Regions:
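Hydrophobic ligand-binding cavity/cleft-lining segments
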Residues: 2-64, 146
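Short beta-alpha junctions and helix-cap segments that line functional grooves
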Residues: 55, 80-82
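Short, hydrophobic/aromatic-rich segments at coil-to-beta transitions
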Residues: 61-68, 87-95
Length: 154
């Protein structure tokens, strides 16, 4: 009797899903002094993300919705692929990785005025970089400076 109970418990444990890692999430926003079309257009140049997302070393287009990337989160290079799962021109871009280090995110664009745009970045990840929220704030600050410098030159 005890043998069959133990065997059933073992079988049930083997069929049970593995414990899922914790999901870390962060959200930040910034107001960029530029029209929404210009702001969206800059972010949608996916290969240029390393210009303001400093942990990214390289992004290369595979096809219209898939990109390979190399990033340097904590002193070591990691590679992966991400997929653009939603793109609403002028409004929103959402993505998720399809590699081992799960990460998903969405960046949204809202006009504040004809010459100002609010950019909101939300990220969810099983990877726990130190101060995820602070990193998003840094990336958005870099993006703001990049866009506003280009806007000032025009």
């Amino acid at each position: 009797m005890h043998g069959s109970l133990f065997e059933n418990s073992t079988e049930a444990m083997n069929r049970a899903p593995a414990v899922q890692p914790a999901i870390n999430a962060a959200q930040q926003f910034v107001v960029v002094r530029a029209p929404i079309a210009r702001v969206y257009e800059q972010w949608s140049r996916i290969e240029d993300l390393p210009r303001f997302v400093t942990s990214l070393r390289q992004v290369r287009r595979i096809d219209d919705t898939h990109f390979s990337y190399v990033w340097h989160p904590n002193g070591e290079d990691k590679q992966g692929i991400f997929h653009i799962v939603l793109q609403i021109p002028g409004r929103r871009i959402a993505w998720r990785t399809i590699s081992n280090d799960f990460m998903s995110g969405v960046v949204s664009f809202e006009p504040c005025s004809e010459q100002e745009t609010e950019v909101t970045l939300k990220v969810r990840s099983i990877f726990d970089p130190p101060n995820l929220s602070r990193r998003l704030e840094e990336y958005l600050g870099n993006f703001k400076r990049l866009v506003e410098r280009a806007e000032d030159r025009e």
